[in-house]
């Protein structure tokens, strides 16, 4: 059987970097997704080879694969706003102990800072 090459896939996806990212994503989908009937036929090949073959043959929707990749990279964490004033004040109190440290480009501002070593003892940086 003929080997699949990047040149075959470049007809579909001209940018090699984009090809690598999309083929990797599709190979992962093949690996995790249950496509037993289709993979049994191509049983001897690994998911990256199957992905490249399908991309070269035009069996994969590149636009759908790109959208799937973008959706997988998005974060879905939602931050809930603080409604209660007491809650917001409690959160502010937790961060009051943090000292304000300003560091210049040459780090000379750290010369007079005092740090705590691993034994819990203070030491100055200019020693």
From Swiss-Prot:
Pfam families: RNA_pol_Rpb6. GO terms for molecular function: DNA binding; DNA-directed RNA polymerase activity. InterPro entries: DNA-dir_RNA_pol_omega, Pol_omega/Rpo6/RPB6, RPB6/omega-like_sf. GO terms for biological process: DNA-templated transcription. It catalyses: RNA(n) + a ribonucleoside 5'-triphosphate = RNA(n+1) + diphosphate. It is an enzyme of class 2 (transferase). One of its GO terms (cellular component) is DNA-directed RNA polymerase complex. Keywords: DNA-directed RNA polymerase, Nucleotidyltransferase, Transcription, Transferase. Its EC number is 2.7.7.6. The RNAP catalytic core consists of 2 alpha, 1 beta, 1 beta' and 1 omega subunit. When a sigma factor is associated with the core the holoenzyme is formed, which can initiate transcription. Promotes RNA polymerase assembly. Latches the N- and C-terminal regions of the beta' subunit thereby facilitating its interaction with the beta and alpha subunits. Belongs to the RNA polymerase subunit omega family. This is DNA-directed RNA polymerase subunit omega. It comes from Rickettsia africae (strain ESF-5).
């Amino acid at each position: 059987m003929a080997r699949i090459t990047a040149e075959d896939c470049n007809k579909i996806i001209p940018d090699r970097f984009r090809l690598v990212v999309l083929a990797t994503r599709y190979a992962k989908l093949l690996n995790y997704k249950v496509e037993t009937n289709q993979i049994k036929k191509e049983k001897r090949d690994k998911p990256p080879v199957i992905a490249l073959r399908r991309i070269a043959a035009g069996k994969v929707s590149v636009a759908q694969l790109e959208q799937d990749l973008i959706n997988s990279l998005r974060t879905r964490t939602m931050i809930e706003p603080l409604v209660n004033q007491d809650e917001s004040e409690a959160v502010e109190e937790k961060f009051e102990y943090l000292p304000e440290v300003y560091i210049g480009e040459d780090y000379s501002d750290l010369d007079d800072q005092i740090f705590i070593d691993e034994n819990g003892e203070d030491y100055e940086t200019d020693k």
